[in-house]
Amino acid sequence: MNTVCAELKSIRTVTDLCIFLRVAGLACALFLGSLTVHAQEITWPQFRGPDSNPVGAHARLADRWSKTENVEWSLEIPGRGWSSPIVTGGKVFVTTATTEGKSKPPQIGTEYSNEYVAELQKQGLSMDQILERVTARDIELPKEVKLHYFLYCLNLTSGKVEWQKEFYTGQPPGGRHRKNSFVSESPVTDGKFVYVYVANLGLWAFDMQGKPAWNTPLEANPIYLDFGTGSSPALIGNLLVIVNDNEKQQYIAAFDKQMGKQVWRTNRDIGGKGQPVQRSGWSTPFVWRHALRTEVVTIGPGEAISYDLAGKELWRLSGMAATPIPMPFAYGGLLYIDGGRGRPLFAIRPGAAGDISLGKDESSNAYIIWSQARAGTYLPSPVAYQGGVYVLTETGILSRYDAKTGTMTYKTRIDPAAAAFTTSPWIYNDKLFCLSEEGQTFVIATGEKFQLLHVNDLDDMSLASPALVGERLLIRTEHRLYSIRRQRLAAGAGTPSTK
């Protein structure tokens, strides 16, 4: 009898141990899973975030702010730059360029020299005279300025500068339209190094403590009308990929991120016969990872082209605008390409090959699920959320399309008083955020019906797209970088500090 009792006790002990181990294993898995989610939330490694579809997941992200409300910290950033902040390991990285002497101030609005050109044409001026006047008013030429390019590293929680590096001093490789900046390309990080790219100038790598790892100079190529540059780099494993569409030789190239040496380069002839005369582009490449393969999707003047990881062309699509700027992105298993102002919005299935361009009167084919004619935008990139694709034009027209069918569910002007939009919209907690160039953020309910909820105002020019990091929203204006964070109400707590 005692033997039987002992055996039963032993069985219960083993059973209890098994249950304990299962529970512990489940708890461990949940904990590790939460760590993974948490790590994803506190990382914003590139322009438009880890998925190139800026949607926040944290429930405490603030939907109201001003220059004082829900501001955890703010920091004045010297100089000017429309690059977006990126975040990793509790550090915020942002680039800027200061100018010795006077600099042409940026402009707000949707007059990108076109109306001025039309006005001069009515006066009967020659093309050379028009170009001279437009350049004098709107273009800052390399010979007119000496620049200092900086990379700043800030503490995410305090906003304090941990270090700053001046990585280049001298004349820029080309001019800029006063709407642009001399450092509009956003850096990218793998968590160990931060990589800085200035088109037609060079690539730089720094470790997390600011120690330079390498620098690769790049040839200077002319940009259409000296408008400046803006295509950010992308990381794929050990490769740092850039796209440089210019007036001399368009190309896509990959560099070893550890040494900075070029691994491959593919020259591009974008557009071809019957396509735009200008060859410059400003769209950032998108790394599309899907079940069939990983590919690099690029948009250039007149055409979109996708490449494999060795630089070989996979497919191409015509119908893009002459001045491509919006970035492609993926959502729900499909690729979305904004063809630019006055051009279509495309939804594409994985596995395309060859020329997938639409024929006359076609809106879909074997690889293009749907397209919406003239739904493209000039500057902001679209964003997708809960079955809808939201498209914002530079003039403040907001449209929503069904992500699967392309059916338009609404199209409306956000606010007649809003001057212009350059920043790409973002989404979290069932709210869409559209930041105007004047620093006003229009907060709109997501869904099939348009509903403007309220407006937040920072009262400063804003052209850079933000970063969403955990429960923080980082907004860069012309003069400052803000960390927007919902204030936690606690006994004896004061207002959030402003650095």
Regions found by a protein language model. Name each.
Residues 1-20:
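N-terminal secretory signal peptides that target proteins for export/translocation
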Residues 1-3, 24, 166, 328:
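Generic low-polarity alpha-helical segments
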Residues 12-15, 25, 51:
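Sequence-pattern detector for short linear motifs
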Residues 18-34:
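Bacterial N-terminal signal peptides
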Residues 38-499:
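Noncatalytic, solvent-exposed loop/strand surfaces
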